[in-house]
Amino acid sequence: MKREKKDYYEILGVPRNATQEEIRKAYKRLVKEWHPDRHPENRKEAEQRFKEIQEAYEVLSDPQKRAMYDRFGYVGEQPVYQEAETGGSFFEDVFREFENIFNRDIFDVFFGEESGRRERREYARRGEDIRYTIEVNLSDLINGTEIPIEYERYETCPRCGGTGVEPDSGYISCPRCGGTGRIREEKRSFFGYFVSERTCDECGGTGRVPQELCHECGGSGRVLRRVRRTIKIPPNIEDGGHLRIPGGGNAGYYGGPYGDLIITVRVRSDSRFKRSGKDLIYDITIDYLQAILGTTVEIPLPEGGTTMLKIPPGTQPETVFRLKGKGLPGEYGRRGDLLVNVHVEIPKNLSREERKVLEDLAKKRGIPVA
């Protein structure tokens, strides 16, 4: 069958020694000039001319295809299966050669993502989540608190409504793929020609492109804004806990929903207390005479203020007193306890008078001392 020879240089109106930049400029000018939407009265002729321009650019923009065209006058398909004179099995050579040509596995092309679906750029996608860290005081966990924050996020472009298209301009068929959403690739090897299809990188597989990109967002459909928001911190959150604010993240793509704002809460350490779940531990040191005779001490509370704790006579070192409901809020709002750990200080040095009083007391009680 005789091949139809076409002068691709003549179709694009460029000389045979034209640079890639000259070819690209000619192509862009011609696809705009001959787009079928611009010739409703001669649409059929325009479509044919448009396809020829597309075909010419497809060949001349590819160095390998252009070299073959310059040499043979056409770019066509040859039988793929030829006798291999290399070591190893025939199919191993085929697979190896295929990978060298396309830079990907043969199964990825024929059975993977490239063959099974069309990856569209302009489908609605959810926006990204944004992560933000807030620090709170221990006292903020008693009744909860509200903290104002300020952060940057992408919002839906108010000019184009997220479409990325300049208002009133609309869409046109993709000039690169001719509206099909697919690009056909031919690669030559010593086995012959391999032909594959891939998603058009110009339109993302949709077959159409904006006639004019939005002047405000540049076609992304999103604009960066600084926003303010008040975050409500619940009373029972743990250190390192997370809060999810639905819709507080970045705007979606092409009408997709907003992502979420994820807050990580860090509780500042309080030197007065140690945490044990919902309980708080407070250490206090009293004099040995207070432990013997009893006393009343002032205990700070995590929410602020103080309470009085009565230490009974004869309190032993490391005695723990439990103040119920004075800890941190737990499930259903029930608070943990405040545990007061009493340390007793024994003096290392005594005055002569103090020592005599204690020696007399020991003698009366029959306690041997040094």
UniProtKB/Swiss-Prot annotation:
This is Chaperone protein DnaJ. Pfam families: DnaJ (PF00226), DnaJ_C (PF01556), DnaJ_CXXCXGXG (PF00684). Binds 2 Zn(2+) ions per monomer. Homodimer. Belongs to the DnaJ family. The keyword Metal-binding applies. It comes from Thermotoga neapolitana (strain ATCC 49049 / DSM 4359 / NBRC 107923 / NS-E). PROSITE patterns: DNAJ_1 (PS00636), DNAJ_2 (PS50076), ZF_CR (PS51188). GO terms for biological process: chaperone cofactor-dependent protein refolding; DNA replication; protein refolding; response to heat. The J domain is necessary and sufficient to stimulate DnaK ATPase activity. Zinc center 1 plays an important role in the autonomous, DnaK-independent chaperone activity of DnaJ. Zinc center 2 is essential for interaction with DnaK and for DnaJ activity. Its cofactor is Zn(2+). InterPro entries: DnaJ, DnaJ_C, DnaJ_domain, DnaJ_domain_CS, HSP40/DnaJ_pept-bd, HSP_DnaJ_Cys-rich_dom, HSP_DnaJ_Cys-rich_dom_sf, J_dom_sf. Zn(2+) 1 binds at C157, C160, C214, C217. It comes from the Bacteria. The gene is dnaJ. Participates actively in the response to hyperosmotic and heat shock by preventing the aggregation of stress-denatured proteins and by disaggregating proteins, also in an autonomous, DnaK-independent fashion. Unfolded proteins bind initially to DnaJ; upon interaction with the DnaJ-bound protein, DnaK hydrolyzes its bound ATP, resulting in the formation of a stable complex. GrpE releases ADP from DnaK; ATP binding to DnaK triggers the release of the substrate protein, thus completing the reaction cycle.
